Amino acid sequence: SLQGSYARFKQKEEGYNRYSLLPRLRLGYQFSDNVFIRYRGQISRKSPGLSDMGNVRQLIDSLQVRSGNPELKIFTVYKNELEADFRKGLFSGNVHLSYQYQHRPIMEETIRDKNNSFVRTNANQLSWQKLNPELELKLGPLKDILTFSFSTGINYYDSRGLDYHHTYTNWYYRAEVMASYKRWSGFFQMENHRNNFYGETLSYGESFHTLGLSYRYKRLNIGMMILNPFVDNYRMGGEMFSKVAPSKNWWYVKESCRLFVAKVSWNISFGRKYETMQKRVNNEDSNAGTLKSGK
């Protein structure tokens, strides 16, 4: 498919007008009843935010200043995804490979001005790339009770600025076990940090595990869940890899460890089943599609 876009911005004497044609391609092929492969590719444009283009300086603290950049330009994003699904009996899986390239992306930079202040701003840098292979495997349900799933992947980042170049690799995983027997069901889920790197900033994702159990009786459902039952420390954070003003920060939330959650629900969707049955019984078209006339 092909679509177009138009972007216009003007601030005093600065501004831009941009017309774009944005192609998108989707392909798929089924090798057999158990194997299917698909490809998706697209080109898109990203415009700078108005707040980033404002010629305004804001004080962050006694040493840092946030500044806009009215010279920011639209940049181009290229995305490619290749995916394959396969199934054999109780075993199924998915292989996913994605690649993204951004040309002259708007990313951060930090400079030191004549007042010895660190000015944090954005500029059209050289390029940003992300490569992400991922594998997902699933087994079950075994004896109509147990289901196992596991996924793992790698995020590789290449961030090139006008005066910096950073690469970063992150391995991540996610595992889950689900069980269901009669009116009871339970699950255990865990995953580690899935981090993101853009410009000169590394943002750490969440790392947690969860244990849950529920019981269903007719329309009543009672459940409980414990977040991070086996650790006593939960944190999130990030790092700035600027050569003039590097930094690291963490947020510790102890309340998110061994956090107990209870849930009680009641299904009150009465009448819906009766209406559905009536529609099935009366699913008859008696209209012949002609007008009737009579005296």
Place the predicted regions along the sequence by residue:
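Outer-membrane beta-barrel strand-turn architecture
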Residues: 21, 27-33, 76, 86-90, ...
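C-terminal beta-barrel architecture of Gram-negative outer-membrane proteins
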Residues: 152-159, 169-216, 220, 225-248
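Outer membrane beta-barrel strand-and-loop segments of large Gram-negative receptors
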Residues: 69, 73, 88, 92-151, ...
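Surface-exposed extracellular loop regions of Gram-negative outer-membrane beta-barrel proteins
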Residues: 1-14, 18-28, 33-78, 97-117, 144-149, 154, 230-246, ...
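C-terminal beta-signal and adjacent terminal beta-strands/loops
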Residues: 217-295
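Transmembrane beta-barrel strands of outer-membrane/channel proteins
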Residues: 2-6, 39-43, 84-86, 95-101, ...
